[in-house]
Amino acid sequence: MAKAKFERNKPHCNIGTIGHVDHGKTSLTAAITKVLAEAGGATFTAYDQIDKAPEEKARGITISTSHVEYETPNRHYAHVDCPGHADYVKNMITGAAQMDGAILVVSAADGPMPQTREHILLARQVGVPAIVVFLNKCDMVDDPELLELVEMEVRELLSKYDFPGDDIPIIKGSALAVLENSDPKLGHDAVLELMKAVDAYIPQPERPVDQPFLMPVEDVFSISGRGTVVTGRVERGIVKVGEEIEIVGIRPTQKTTVTGVEMFRKLLDQGQAGDNIGALLRGTKREDVERGQVLCKPGSVKPHTKFKAEAYILTKEEGGRHTPFFTNYRPQFYFRTTDVTGVVHLPAGTEMVMPGDNVAMEVHLIVPIAMEEKLRFAIREGGRTVGAGVVASIIE
């Protein structure tokens, strides 16, 4: 069967299923593709197809993830599902599969469990903007009061981690009912209702090109008679010739003007998100700019040295450390294009961090870096990746 080509005429959104092991994340993913396939918006992907997730590398870390795509009348979705809990932790922290929203799957028969809590906390730490809940396995619960109790527990848990627990849509159903063609009300209808809620409740992400301009500096050249050219890939936004920009990070912030934009040796009047460009900077000397800084729209990003982060520390088998580390550990933090040394402070009550752990930590960098919440980084020792992290909040 030939794969139908998805027409990109609808807004695109990245989502994923999260929740405790065996609560039905993968079954729900399969059920969504089955229900939407009837309307021609997907190709049905069976449970065992999704379950044997291929391995991929992100920031030097191997993660297993399954990707399916489907569309509703309003949107096109890329949906990610992970086989194991460790894969979720790694995926959310590295941002390997960016999530604009998540479907939290909770088994009605069991209620919230430890990983339910951990995934909600991770979603908060890594900045997942919105969550919709699917209360699964409702066909296994006869008592409607019990369902209400589980729903209340889930709402309280979401509120505890600063999600709007009272407002979040909770859809009750059964993924198995879809896959076994049994109860259409709990199966087919519930999945359609879930997708309606996802369409309506998960906000449409702003496209990178509509965000304020930012380009990490990869290289700096001096071109005789023309000035200094800075190269890199535009991360977001648009830069036009003649616009004023700032150079942020490592040293005091400087202002300059872009007098030319080049791509593939051709002159352009602008560069935009995704382009690999060379930007000619007015009156800027070769030694004024270095790799690791960013060019950005004035005032849009500030340099910082202290932040709180959520990090995953690689196991020995993944090529990470063989031993734990303690407070005052001093690795390098690789942001965008460069390593900066930083000092780690562990939270009260955390004596040490073992390889394979994920941990909330505070980091003090020795020089300021252009950063904002949700920025990803690698933790390295002498060029070897030993962990991955994401900025949860900025201190100063």
UniProtKB/Swiss-Prot annotation:
Q: Where is this region: G4?
A: 136-139
In this chain, Mg(2+) is annotated as bound at 26
Q: Where is this region: G3?
A: 81-84
- What residue spans carry the region label G5? 174-176
Q: What class of enzyme is it?
A: hydrolase
Superkingdom field: Bacteria
In this entry, which stretches build a coiled coil? none
Q: Where is the tr-type G domain?
A: 10-206
Task: Kindly state which reaction or reactions the protein catalyses.
Answer: GTP + H2O = GDP + phosphate + H(+)
Report a single Gene Ontology molecular function: translation elongation factor activity
Q: Which CDD domains match?
A: EF_Tu, EFTU_II, EFTU_III
Q: Which residues bind GTP?
A: 19-26, 81-85, 136-139
Question: Where, subcellularly, is it found?
Answer: Cytoplasm
Describe its function.
GTP hydrolase that promotes the GTP-dependent binding of aminoacyl-tRNA to the A-site of ribosomes during protein biosynthesis.
What is the annotated quaternary arrangement, including any partners? Answer: Monomer.
Q: What name does the UniProt record give this protein? A: Elongation factor Tu
